[in-house]
From Swiss-Prot:
GO cellular component, one term: cytoplasm
Annotated organism of origin: Coxiella burnetii (strain RSA 331 / Henzerling II)
InterPro entries per the UniProt record, alphabetical: ADOMET_SYNTHASE_CS, S-AdoMet_synt_C, S-AdoMet_synt_central, S-AdoMet_synt_N, S-AdoMet_synthetase, S-AdoMet_synthetase_sfam
Pfam families from the UniProt entry: S-AdoMet_synt_C, S-AdoMet_synt_M, S-AdoMet_synt_N
NCBIfam families per the UniProt record, alphabetical: metK
Name of the protein in question: S-adenosylmethionine synthase
Keyword field contains GTP-binding: no
Amino acid sequence: MTHTTLFTSESVSEGHPDKVADQISDAVLDALIGQDPNCRVACEAVVKSGMVFVAGEITTNAWADVEQITRNTVLQIGYNDPHLGFDGETCAVVTAIGKQSPDIVMGVDGREDQELGAGDQGLMFGYASRETDVFMPAPITYAHRLVRQQALLRKNGRLPWLRPDAKSQVTLRYENGKPVAADCIVLSTQHSPEISQESLREAVIDEIIKPIMPPHWLDKHTRFLVNPTGRFVIGGPVGDCGLTGRKIIVDTYGGMARHGGGCFSGKDPSKVDRSGAYAARYVAKNIVAGGLADRCEIQVSYAIGVAEPTSISVETFGTGKIDEVRIQQLIKEHFDLRPGKIIEELNLLRSIYKATATYGHFGREEPEFTWERTDKAEILREAAGLAAANVTN
């Protein structure tokens, strides 16, 4: 008997106000970590109408022009016209930045790199599945690709009436756990006032949705909802306040996996909210790529100032080819999940973070995304005593 279910994930464009804030936070981090790899950064941003407020705790020997970094980021996104109500040339930039608490420094710094203590307590999840060629859930993968396509057509001038703010939502139909069709696709995009709704709908379906979605998933039952409220001229930080760290499900697995609650952007890799989640994805992806399971979720947890994880757990949702206890043993044998070793293994002390702030931190194929490597898949497969796996990444 066929078991049919629906699952939905959403994504947002680089011009969405929360993503504007994420990009500012990570742009500041990149500017500092490139000069001072041992900097400690926790940088938050709030954006609204004509103002950006940047705040946080930063301890570093480097210097960065936070105001200019903020303006450049806003302009690069596409908010470069006063008529939009928010632009990088004229917006006010207010900063309130202090230093990291010395109580935290005691537990994190001043040790050998491999014994670097976790920057805070917390729990993180990593996930991978065989649904897509990038070992990610299909709904979030295609939701990201839709808003990336919107940005591409906006920036290259093919659809000049597009504006920076946009959201996508993809509902896929699953049969026996595998995606087989698109049930509903929502694409809401900010636009200039002169474009008609009829022309906008036609262009979005033909130029954004159809080139991205697999054609065999689109049938007579697929619903296309383009700007469902009609007009979307006012958008970005004029329409909504944006805040760093408010799109944590968009940043990860679109709701297909659990989330520990900590955001990524604006945090240097001593913060395990970020580095621990990246490592958990690295572990889960190698387990799936190695053929040990078709789906895998890893949980890892830490205590502030302590290097060793307080727990590691594995869930394979009944798809494991070997016992989960054995998978957990293999993780401990082949992955060092102390923060200092994660940073070293994944080469995280680099200016790579602004690129992660849009279109998801996982399922990316750019070389900077070192946690997407499957270099341990074959090692895990052999250690598990399994036949050759089909490793595609």
